[in-house]
Amino acid sequence: WPMEYLGNYIRPDRIEKDDIILFPHRDAPEKQLNIFKELEKELPQYKWINCNDYNLTKKEYNQLLEQSKMVFSANLQETLGISCYEILMAGGMPLVPNRLSYVEMYEDIFKYPSKCTLDWKGYQDHKTILIGKIETMMNNFNAPEIQDAIKSNRQSLLEQYFTATNLYQELQ
């Protein structure tokens, strides 16, 4: 099972992380890259990286995850969200809308109101909420509440979604 090997390649123990926010999703309309780019203008104190702008090897991508504090999602379509799990594996945090598979997979601390990114108008109408959430999470990254949530969410996803243990047991 491919996800079970991530722990061999992504390390969560990098002590100092940089103020980097990643967009590791493909460039597709339902991923709303335009919102990410607009947030970059609104919050220039952070380094915003669209991973598609670079020809990263898997090793380079994993190192970037380990260096970064956040993966941002404004997705309108998602079934699993591997990159949001990868940032947890790297000791960082996802920031996801409270919709789609994110509702059941991610702890509330990592969610923002869905209305903030339902569409461009929703973003324009509610961007102060989203900007405030990003600033709060980035500024308090080392707070016990966030660090504990990273660890517990990583463990729950590993046990519930990113393991083939139940499949192996069924096959025996």
Regions found by a protein language model. Name each.
Residues 62, 85-89, 100-104:
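Short alpha-helical segment that forms part of, or immediately flanks, the ligand-binding pocket
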